[in-house]
C-alpha cells in the first residue's frame, strides 16, 4: 500500500467571461457543441493521467489550463449548480482536507470477456481503505470470495469530467445524468468522510448494465448482513414505489464508508 497526500484537489476556476445558463432538462445544439469541444480537449489529458494512474486526482486548475475562457465558464456552471434544483439525492458533501492520505490500489485484475484486465488505478483515504481491507478479510473467511474496488476516490474535477462524459447516455439531460452520476462536490466518491466504493467481482460483474446481476450475488447478500460492522452502508437502495423519476437510480454496487463521528 502506497500513501498519497491530497494536495490541492479542489480549487476555483478564475473566469472573467460571461456565465452560461445551462439547460437542466436537455442541452440545445450550442450546449452539445460546447460540451463536445470540451471533451475533445480534455480526453487526451485524462487518458494520459489514466495511464499514469493519477486520473482520480485531477484538479480543476489542470482542466482549466486546457480550455478556453468560454469552455471554462461552461464548466463553472456545473460547479455552481444548486443540488436541490437538479433533484435526485444530491447534496453538498465535505471536500477532502489538504492533509488527507490515500492508499493506492494498482494491482487489481478482473475478467473482461474471459480475459484478465487490470483495473484502472484507484485511491482510497486510509481509514476507508483499512476498513475495506478488514471487511474483505471477513468476507473471504465467510464466503471464500472478495470484492474489488472498481472506483474509489474521485476528485471533484474528475467527477465533473465523468459527468460530462456520461451525458450523451442520458439524453444530454443534467437532471437525468444526475440520477446516475453525481454533480462535482455532491459525490460520495469525492468526500473522504463518506467515501464511496463501487465494487466489482474478480469475474467482472459490476451491475452497471443490469443492477439485478450484482444484486443476485452472494457477496451482495453478505454486504447487507455485515457491511455495517465495518462502517459501510448502501448509498442508493431501490427507490420506493411511487417515489418519482427524480430519485437516484438503484446502485447495489455503490457503498460508502462513514468515518466515526462524521457529520454532514
What residue spans do the PLM features occupy?
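Bacterial N-terminal signal peptides that target proteins for export
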Residues: 1-7
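Extracytoplasmic cell-surface/polysaccharide-interacting catalytic and binding patches
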Residues: 20-151, 165-264
